[in-house]
Amino acid sequence: MVIGVGNRWRGDDGAGLAVARRVRELAPAWVEVRELEGDATALVEAWSGAEHAVVVDAAESGAPPGTVRRFDAAAGRLPVHSLRSSTHAFGVADAVELARALGRLPGRLDVYAIEGASFTAGGSLSPEVERAVDDLATALTHP
């Protein structure tokens, strides 16, 4: 299962959604792909029953734009500073910890953060993030 999180109307904050759309194009039909905009608490329900879930969101940590980082969320707490949550009322890291407390984490949960360059309203994905989206979607569908 691949879940893209973000806001398509705020520039690079749409990176997770773009990865989900690209994975949907590349992956076999049996791969479940979801796009979530808004409050990340919906993640807890979205990955319910999944043995392995991949979540992709934008990051704003000061790394170079287009940098992709992977976190093993089932193994421990996510570094909150590495994930963007300002356009989500409740961020991915918060949703992971809520699911952990409720005993509702998938057996394996990989969270990918794509470093953005611009999160302005009405903007599109930056070239660096577009490349990262394509590279990550390809890596996820052709391991």
Predicted features and spans:
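N-terminal catalytic or cofactor-binding beta/alpha core of small enzyme domains
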Residues: M1-S118, G123-D134, A139-P143
